[in-house]
Design a protein with these regions (language model features):
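N- or domain-start disorder-to-order transition segments that initiate the globular core
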Residues: 1-24
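Histidine-acidic residue clusters that define the catalytic metal-binding segment
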Residues: 1-6, 144-186, 218-223, 349, ...
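An aromatic/glycine/proline-enriched structural segment found at the starts
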Residues: 2-5, 149-150, 154-157, 182-251, ...
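Buried hydrophobic packing residues in well-ordered domains
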Residues: 12, 30, 48, 86, ...
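M16/MPP (pitrilysin/insulinase) zinc-metallopeptidase core fold and M16-derived inactive scaffolds
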Residues: 27-89, 155-158, 269-285
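M16/insulysin-pitrilysin zinc metalloprotease superfamily fold
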Residues: 57, 89-122, 290, 294-352
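A structural supersecondary motif
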Residues: 165, 244-248, 267-308
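C-terminal regions of mature proteins
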Residues: 187-190, 307, 328, 336-412
């Protein structure tokens, strides 16, 4: 059970606080409710671009890193389809430095032609390194575009194309910042060796006088039900052929999300899983085979991913996976498998939140889902999954008409 405090500023900023007496450090975790799904389809990559722009300095801190490092701190950030997250860790006695830096860049971010052009160049180079000049780099561009036809999950967080990043105008960038980077679109968690009263006081001091922004109401295109199987072959000179099968599933807030997640574990988590025992070891057709969920807040994907052994055809590989899925749907999950996966999830959850920093991130994510208190209910949601419920979800999910298949590699 994680005990934490909550506070809401009059301008809408949500503050979470977790006290840890076993450290002399404090972490600030700032989660902005904006991800790549909030981008214009003709101007993708802005959410990730801002992950870089936020470190270009501000009016009173031209070099963001210098005062933080002088205070013994460090920082980083990441972007996803659903959110953008920034965090600092520093000694408790210097915590106000982080509040000042975050407040200043929210109010006076250095959005100049020079800083924008510099960071565009950095992101374009990152795009080339991650997506164009490395084996399998564009795999998920094809996966997303195949599985999604209207929802903005159809492009990756880094952006759809280099040209989208290159052609983003100063006006587009400034408008994106004004619309999404605001106190009423921010969840702040202060965790570590700091009392709640001090966390509240510092938050009020550095963020209390911000005016709330007029945050756009999300009106995202909803993905229609897929009614027939989709297949795409992409020829690429990569070391191994890859087969990816994607089934539409519910989003992170849905009651069946944990069931889908457990289904992926029953199939592929560990050496006692179905895929490992019955397919990977026995068939020799694959060097890797796993199942996972995308974990997105809007309806996402249940993904079966395989690397094929040299000389194995895509048809034979798919036949083996289809046969194992059909056998699973016919025989069903055992009570032992469900209990094993629930135990594994609980241990993973505990290890994932051992530190005050990780608790801070998780608290923000659960708050964005709807209620930070749900962090203490998550294990129970896995514990109450029954065999019947798991199989009902599996039978609806693992429907061939609900599947998009990507054949990727030299033999595609």
């Amino acid at each position: 059970m994680i005990s934490f405090n909550t506070y809401r500023l009059k301008n809408g900023l949500r503050l979470l606080h977790y006290y840890d007496k076993n450290t002399q450090m404090v972490a600030l975790n700032l989660l902005y409710d904006v991800g790549s799904k909030d981008e214009n389809p003709k101007a993708t990559g802005l959410a990730h671009l801002f992950e870089h722009l936020m470190f270009t300095g501000s009016k009173n801190a031209p070099n963001f890193d210098a005062p933080l490092q002088a205070a013994g701190g460090s920082s980083n950030a990441w972007t996803s389809v659903d959110m953008t997250n920034y965090y600092e860790t520093l000694p408790a006695q210097n915590v106000e430095t982080a509040f000042w830096l975050e407040s200043d860049r929210l109010r006076y971010l250095n959005l100049t032609d020079e800083s924008i052009d510099t960071q565009k160049s950095v992101v374009i180079e990152e795009f080339k390194q991650r997506c164009l000049n490395v084996p399998y780099g564009d795999l998920y561009h094809f996966c997303n575009d195949l599985a999604y036809k209207v929802h903005p999950y159809r492009w990756p967080t880094i952006g759809l194309t280099v040209d989208d990043i290159k052609n983003a105008s100063y006006e587009d960038i400034k408008s994106f910042f004004a619309q999404h980077y605001a106190v009423n679109n921010l969840i702040l968690c202060v965790s570590g060796h700091i009392e709640f009263e001090k966390a509240v006081a510092l938050t009020e001091k550095w963020f209390g006088d911000f005016a709330p922004a007029n945050i756009p109401v999300r009106n995202l295109a909803q993905e229609p039900v897929q009614t027939e199987q989709r297949i795409l072959s992409v020829k690429r000179e990569v070391p191994q052929n890859m087969l990816t099968m994607m089934y539409h599933m519910c989003g992170r807030r849905d009651a069946d999300y944990q069931v889908c997640d457990m289904l992926s574990d029953v199939l592929s988590n560990g050496m006692s899983s179905r895929f490992y025992r019955n397919v990977l070891v026995k068939s020799g057709l694959f060097t890797e085979l796993d199942a996972s969920v995308s974990g997105t807040y809007d309806p996402g994907l249940f993904i079966v991913r395989a690397r094929l052994t040299d000389g194995v055809s895509f048809a034979k590989a798919k036949e083996a996976i289809d046969a194992e899925l059909a056998d699973f749907l016919r025989t069903g999950a055992t009570a032992y498998e469900i209990e094993k996966c629930a135990n594994k999830y609980e241990s993973t959850q505990l290890f994932d939140m051992l530190t005050y920093e990780k608790k801070g991130v998780k608290l923000c994510q659960y708050e964005l889902l709807g209620d930070a208190a749900d962090i203490n209910k998550e294990v129970g949601k896995y514990r109450c999954i029954t065999q019947d419920r798991l199989m009902n979800v599996a039978k609806n999910l693992l429907n061939p008409d609900n599947c998009s298949i990507l054949y990727y590699g030299p033999d595609a």
